[in-house]
Amino acid sequence: MPAAKKQIEEKPEVEQDLGAPDFSDLLDDDEKTLIDSVVNDDDESDELTDDAIGMAVGELVGMGVMFLTDYLAERRGEHWNVSTKELKQLAKAVDGSVPDTELSPAWALVAVSVGMFAPRVVVDIQLNKRKVIEVENDDKKAD
């Protein structure tokens, strides 16, 4: 029992030695955050600036599409590549439609991916059928 009592008595000393954490140096309250921009009812501007928004939804979707198409282009063929012009048009369209449709970035990526990948999947299917036909023709010629 005396050892347990000694541990209880030592605990307040440890707390006093460590003190309370001070995070005031880490916080930068001078910068306006996205939440501040939305909450404030300043009549200066109804739209958020690029600085307040950070990366737009269209850019995020474009990055996701670029990642997926680059991966698939390496494995399935050049028809999976997406041009820079196509990505810029995509980002602009997504940024324009997200506020009206109230899509989250994840749902925007899903919707855009379906629209962009469907034609490429069709091309994949056609290419695979063509390869099967060529192999069958080669087999017939060999017989």
UniProtKB/Swiss-Prot annotation:
Disordered: annotated segments: 1-25
Biased composition (Basic and acidic residues): 1-14
Protein name (record): Uncharacterized protein Gp-h
Organism of origin: Pseudoalteromonas phage PM2 (Bacteriophage PM2)
